[in-house]
């Protein structure tokens, strides 16, 4: 499966059960990266994608367990450790800022045998610079 996450400079993802930030340009980039694939999300993330042009997205609290090998999973509030063996691709969006955090990205791409394939930067709607890193096995 393909995992998509957003992190701060310390790999933080959430604070006090809330996302650290949001950016409409980033959501558009995610939608454009799906290559007609399925997007699976937790109910918490639904409002981020409700007005986007995603052809097929599925909402489930068990989305990581239900994902097929070619599915994309947008992860904000779940641990990835137990699902690590099934991850073939990891897309990390970096806010390039420090935010308070108590939930962190709990996998290391290098430890999973992944290599950095590409890095791109773009200006977001609420961030001067967002970095997109694509890792693959």
Feature map (PLM): residue ranges:
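Enzymes that bind and transform nitrogen-containing heteroaromatic metabolites
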Residues: 1-137
